[in-house]
Structures are given as C-alpha cells and as structure tokens.
Amino acid sequence: MSRSSRQSRDRELPEGAPGTEASGLVLVDKPAGWTSHDVVGKVRRLAGTRKVGHAGTLDPMATGLLVVGFNKATRLLTAITGTDKTYLATIRLGVSTVTDDAEGDVLQTRLANAVTPERVDAAVADLTGDLQQVPSAVSAIKVDGQRAYHRVRAGEDVRLDARPVTVRRFEVTGYRRAEDGTTVDLDVEVDCTSGTYIRALARDLGEALETGGHLTALRRTAVGPFSVTDAVTLEDLAVRFTSTELSVAAAGLFPVRRLSGEEASELSFGRRIEATGTEGMVAAQAPDGTVVALICDQERQGRPEVLSAKPEIVFAPATAPAAASTQDGGRT
C-alpha cells in the first residue's frame, strides 16, 4: 500500500480506531436485517484490522447484543460464547413456519382460540429447566460438513439430534389475543445457556399448546456479564470507535490472579505456574496490570495428586523476567 493510500485510509477511520496494535471487545447493538458476519465486516473496516470475530451468532431478523473481539481479544471469544444469554422475544401461537420464525414460509395455521393464560403458564413451566432441545432445522449447525440451512434450502428433510440445554427463566410478560381469536402473541423473557434456540422454544411451546408457534421478534439483551445497555450502534461506532481493552475485559470476565514478574514470564512461554486454588478459568495479571493469560488448575501428567495452573490462552508475547536491581538484592 502506498503512503498516500495509507493516509487516505487512516483519514476514513473513526476516532479511537485501534488498527492492528490494540486489542479489545466492542459491544454492538446489531440492527435487524444484518447478519452477524455483516457486523464483523463493518467492524473490520472501522477498526482498521482484519482480525475480528464475534461471540455467538444472531439471526438476521434479531437485534441486540453482539460481542465482537478484535486482534488478540478474539482469543477471548470462545470463553464468552459459552456464557449464559438473555433474550426478549415475541411468540405467535396459531402459525407454524419452516424456519420457526417470521422469515420462513407458513407450514400450518391452527386456531388459538382455546389458549388461556393458565395453559400457557403450564406449558412454559414444562419448557423451563434442563431440556433436551431439537434445534431448528434452518440453523448453522453442520450436518456431514454442510450447514443445516443449506440442506433445507436444497429440499432435504433435515432432522437434527436433540441437545441438552438449560432454560433458567422463561417468563411471559405480555399476552395479546387477536380480535378474531386466530392467534395469540406472547412477549417473553428468557435466560438460558449457550446453544439454546429461542426459535425452537417458540416451536415447542406451540406444539405443547396444539396450535403451532413461531418467533416474530427477538432481541438479545445480555451475554454473560455484558449488557445491551452498554452497547453502541454501528452508526455511533463509525464516528467514535468505543471498546473495552483486552485486560479490562478479561479481568471483568474471570477471577484475577496477580502474578510476580517471574510467573508472568513463565506463562508467556506457555509454562505452568503454582495452582490458583480456584475452580474454572482465571485471568493471570502481570505486575503492570496487563492480563498475560487465562489459566486453569489441572493435574500434572502422571501425577494426579499435584495441581498446577496451566495457561489455556496466552495473550502476551514470550518475555524473559526483568533482571533484579541491586536495590532488590540482585547482582549487576
């Protein structure tokens, strides 16, 4: 790239664009009609770096929180993807669709005039807790190496296996019956584990009530500790690139273990250090406050009685420990 081309590109970047040097997370309020991949492409252009990813797909019709990582923070995304999610949704009873949402062709219509709030509450209770959920056939799940939605569009009858999910909360916050009694719209709020399909919940609720059902609106309001109230629109991001620095994000996601300089160096080389005594992932923080790695206590191979902290994800480049000064009793 010529110098003039680089200067032209830099002038187009918003204030605060990180380029390829800084790393962090961006909380984006995804608009309807955009795919998650579309959002990643937009953030790439605004950030000035190609290394961008997201922590969990949102369907094009859905809006709300999409956690996007850039540069080294993309390594955090796997851990974020596995966290619980919160959604606001609207379910229409009385109509089933191919996709289990409003974007698919109608499969069947059945009168919902026999639906009552009491029956809805009972069916919702049965769909709360630990479930074996069959994902929507029109999904990004791979079947023999090909996305399920590609197979459905090619005319195949795709049947996906049930998967364990947990719906921690399934609350009906609004109930609206059509004047002619043909459909009932339910506004709901759902807290669930990663991998739960809200479209499938709408479908299963409709089946339980013998009316059929599909999703007409979906908004993700939380991913783990992150809230959509802290998210920015793509329009705002184009003016000022707002992000959370990698070390701050990691320290907010996991318990923090403060390291000595020697421990930080060991982890930067991928070596184990003394066990943390904490269950699960821990953010290992160097003396200067930067997060060197995410670590987890594990048994040593061949010595199951000995635990040590193993680096699962290393962010810092390999660095030798700083030489001790004479004031610290070191040798010159």
Predicted segment positions?
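Acidic, low-complexity central loop/insert segments
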Residues: 79-135
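Accessory RNA 3′-end/elbow-binding domains used by RNA modification enzymes
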Residues: 2-31, 37-54, 58, 62, ...
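Glycine/acidic-rich beta-strand-loop module
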Residues: 51-81, 137, 150
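Extended alpha-helical targeting/anchoring segments
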Residues: 139, 143-168
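Structural signature of FAD isoalloxazine-binding scaffolds in flavoprotein oxidoreductases
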Residues: 78-93, 158-172
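Pseudouridine synthase
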Residues: 140, 147, 152, 184-229
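The conserved catalytic core of RNA pseudouridine synthases
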Residues: 45-48, 67, 157-202, 207-210
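Residue-level signal for inorganic ion chemistry
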Residues: 68, 89, 145, 201, ...
